[in-house]
Amino acid sequence: MARLTRLLPLAALVLSACSITPPKGPGKSPDAPQWRQHQQEVRNLSQYQTRGAFAYLSDQQKVYARFFWQQTGQDRYRLLLLNPLGSTELELKAQPGEAQITDNKGQQYTGTDAEEMIGKLTGMPIPINSLRQWILGLPGDATDYKLDDQYRLSQMNYSQNGKTWKVIYGGYDSATKPALPSSMELTEGGQRIKLKMDNWIVK
């Protein structure tokens, strides 16, 4: 599979080199009932989709793309990475126990671990298994996190397999109920992943 460095337009100015900074001021307690209620409302979402801009930045490669994320059921989701012309560079379909990736040449790969497959095929170690929760503003398995003044996830640290990811949320889309993230940044060592969500559709 040709690595996704072809996706690299400098047109992705929406994801500039500047970093997201967490909101200033005191956050709310993770023990607050408002936070528990928000988490439950998000978990109750059975289907949702979002699209936006994606960037992966490291010393080895810089990748910019459009993305489309669709959750169709419990542990069933689809991820598309698109080039600036709108053509699909990578499609991931996942369901319990099975993941399938199709590259830009139509070659298909199947396996059981979507995260491992994406890392091997693209050279981008995206923590997709955790990102499924993080993109919704849920901590997943992370226990080291902070809330903003609206009882929503503000930032967190998550360590697994010798890596520690730091996640910072740049804002939330209050037009959706419950409010869902509008931008986020993940950093680990010398690599950075940035996501900017244009909009959300929830059911």
Curated annotation (Swiss-Prot):
GO terms for biological process: lipoprotein localization to outer membrane; protein transport. It comes from the Bacteria. Keywords: Cell outer membrane, Chaperone, Lipoprotein, Membrane, Palmitate, Protein transport, Signal, Transport. One of its GO terms (cellular component) is cell outer membrane. A lipid is attached at residue 18 (S-diacylglycerol cysteine). It is a lipid-anchor. Residues 1-17 form the signal peptide. It is found in: Cell outer membrane. Monomer. Plays a critical role in the incorporation of lipoproteins in the outer membrane after they are released by the LolA protein. Belongs to the LolB family. This is Outer-membrane lipoprotein LolB. It comes from Enterobacter sp. (strain 638). The gene is lolB.
